[in-house]
Amino acid sequence: MKFLQQMRKLFGLAAKFPARLTIAVIGTALLAGLVGVVGDTAIAVAFSKPGLPVEYLQVPSPSMGHDIKIQFQGGGQHAVYLLDGLRAQEDYNGWDINTPAFEEYYHSGLSVIMPVGGQSSFYSNWYQPSQGNGQHYTYKWETFLTQEMPSWLQANKNVLPTGNAAVGLSMSGSSALILASYYPQQFPYAASLSGFLNPSEGWWPTMIGLAMNDSGGYNANSMWGPSTDPAWKRNDPMVQIPRLVANNTRIWVYCGNGAPNELGGDNIPAKFLESLTLSTNEIFQNTYAASGGRNGVFNFPPNGTHSWPYWNQQLVAMKPDIQQILNGSNNNA
């Protein structure tokens, strides 16, 4: 109801604006509304099948000043990091809440790592605690994912800090590609599912900032500063394509076109945002190819909305590819 009321107000205001600004205002409203549609499936019990060897670890993060909960399924020395969406919860990772990912990667020869928390974080190192929502520490997710957690897992779970895959959806799609851009030994494989792949361009900083504010009251200026700050480009996969090409990172990029199929997701925000996101994904593919990139899989099917069933379908589809690249298993089951 709150979302519908916001939309009515914004559609009324938009009539007074120029066309480009009208599109941005409506897009921002839908983006903020979609945060609830996609990620706000708060339930107390995660999806893991009973009997799977899923552990709940508390990994120290000196940079953030507290332990971070990790859902972990051991399966090999190489691992798949499954990153969450904008409304990441503090109890379980969204991949476990909304998909059978642990089951799908059981006996794959790969360990599965699901960090818990990080709402609106973009899994990035922020400048300061979020201003306006009372956050008492500074997000340092990049430090945690690339230094603190890998060291702990190597010492305690025999998971190597090199030769892993980062898989992200929506918010974390860009995060996965950025992690691979700057840490190629740790992440020779990165997958973005319906990710925002050019966040520093045009109206994206504004839309991202408003969506973050809607999802926990987080302040994008506390993350990367104003849109003119170099941190926005530093964390922009489109800008960092030369790094991905030079690293020869294996990338998997997926985005639907907003048309639902039998998997569902037939609601206005999910359809609109996926169609809005598709254009930056297509530009990313063209720019990647023009930059000499030859190690990517790009899936842009004639269907798919911004919702979990489509992302899970891609996670299953990429499993043999991940196994081959990471050499984590000869079993493609």
Swiss-Prot record:
Gene Ontology CC annotations of this record: extracellular region
Protein keywords: Acyltransferase, Secreted, Signal, Transferase
Chief localisation class: secreted
Source taxon at top rank: Bacteria
Signal peptide: 1-44
Residues binding substrate, per UniProt: 86-87, 170, 198, 276-279, 306-308
Pfam families per UniProt: Esterase
One GO MF term: diacylglycerol O-acyltransferase activity
Active site, UniProt feature: 170 (nucleophile), 274, 306
Localization of this protein: Secreted
Claim: Kinase is one of the keywords in the record: no
Known catalytic reactions: an acyl-CoA + a 1,2-diacyl-sn-glycerol = a triacyl-sn-glycerol + CoA; 2 alpha,alpha'-trehalose 6-mycolate = alpha,alpha'-trehalose 6,6'-bismycolate + alpha,alpha-trehalose
SUPFAM superfamilies, A to Z: alpha/beta-Hydrolases
Protein family membership: Belongs to the mycobacterial A85 antigen family.
Subunit structure: Homodimer.
Function: The antigen 85 proteins (FbpA, FbpB, FbpC) are responsible for the high affinity of mycobacteria to fibronectin, a large adhesive glycoprotein, which facilitates the attachment of M.tuberculosis to murine alveolar macrophages (AMs). They also help to maintain the integrity of the cell wall by catalyzing the transfer of mycolic acids to cell wall arabinogalactan and through the synthesis of alpha,alpha-trehalose dimycolate (TDM, cord factor).
PANTHER family on file: DIACYLGLYCEROL ACYLTRANSFERASE_MYCOLYLTRANSFERASE AG85A, ENTEROCHELIN ESTERASE-RELATED
Identification of the protein by name: Diacylglycerol acyltransferase/mycolyltransferase Ag85C
Gene (name only): fbpC
